[in-house]
Amino acid sequence: MKILEDRIRQDGTVLTGNVLKVDNFLNHQVDPQLMNELGQEFARRFQDAHITKILTVESSGIAPAVMAGLHLNVPVIFARKHKSLTLTDNLYTAKVYSYTKQVTNEISIDRRFLAADDRVLIIDDFLANGQAVQGLLDIAKTAQITVAGVGVVIEKRFQKGHQMVTDAGIQLEALASIASFEAGQVIFAQD
């Protein structure tokens, strides 16, 4: 998606450890117009997948997921990383390791929000090693729901997440696919 690649080139910063900082439009400050365009593109790519719900993990996946939900006209469920007074029992849970934060979280989704006939689309901000997506796949398996696809705003194709999703036979749509980082620059995949 050219508009996203251009924005990454303009505002993204490559940090050590293969980390791409995009906090000025996606991970901290959010550009609503760009999120709307990302949501439209996800909706276009998954328009024939008969999606009933979108799953994501708090917090950076929420903005693109909500916009996709708006354009697909389906609800969005975000897995919580922390328990609260209102989220205590009857939960689907999975452990997820965060590459950027170097911590393991237990993500949770209230069982009331998933039904056996659901066809879900998993949306996240990044796909690198695939831990967040794997956690949502684990929850989907436990809930016995169908994962119709995975959509990510940015994927680092050189890390194992891409292969994990495609090996599982799941439709994967990345709006920007990074082949590598070279001399502090983002090199996008050409396919």
UniProtKB/Swiss-Prot annotation:
Taxonomic source organism: Levilactobacillus brevis (strain ATCC 367 / BCRC 12310 / CIP 105137 / JCM 1170 / LMG 11437 / NCIMB 947 / NCTC 947)
CDD domains in alphabetical order: PRTases_typeI
Catalytic activity field: XMP + diphosphate = xanthine + 5-phospho-alpha-D-ribose 1-diphosphate
Principal localisation: cytoplasm
Cysteine disulfide partners in this protein: none
Signal peptide coordinates: none
Transmembrane segments: none
Pathway assigned to this chain's UniProt record: Purine metabolism; XMP biosynthesis via salvage pathway; XMP from xanthine: step 1/1
InterPro entries for the chain: PRibTrfase_dom (IPR000836), PRTase-like (IPR029057), Pur/Pyrimidine_PRTase (IPR050118), Xanthine_PRibTrfase (IPR010079)
UniProt EC number: 2.4.2.22
Subcellular location: Cytoplasm
Any one Gene Ontology molecular-function term assigned to this protein's record: xanthine phosphoribosyltransferase activity
Residue numbers binding xanthine: L20, N27, K156
Pfam families registered for this protein in UniProt: Pribosyltran
Annotated family: Belongs to the purine/pyrimidine phosphoribosyltransferase family. Xpt subfamily.
Enzyme class of the recorded protein, top EC level: transferase
GO term, biological process aspect, one: xanthine metabolic process
Gene Ontology CC terms, in alphabetical order: cytoplasm
Organism lineage string: Bacteria, Bacillati, Bacillota, Bacilli, Lactobacillales
Name by which UniProt lists this protein: Xanthine phosphoribosyltransferase
Positions that bind 5-phospho-alpha-D-ribose 1-diphosphate: A128, N129, G130, Q131, A132
Keywords per UniProt: Cytoplasm, Glycosyltransferase, Purine salvage, Transferase
UniProt subunit comment: Homodimer.
Function recorded in the entry: Converts the preformed base xanthine, a product of nucleic acid breakdown, to xanthosine 5'-monophosphate (XMP), so it can be reused for RNA or DNA synthesis.
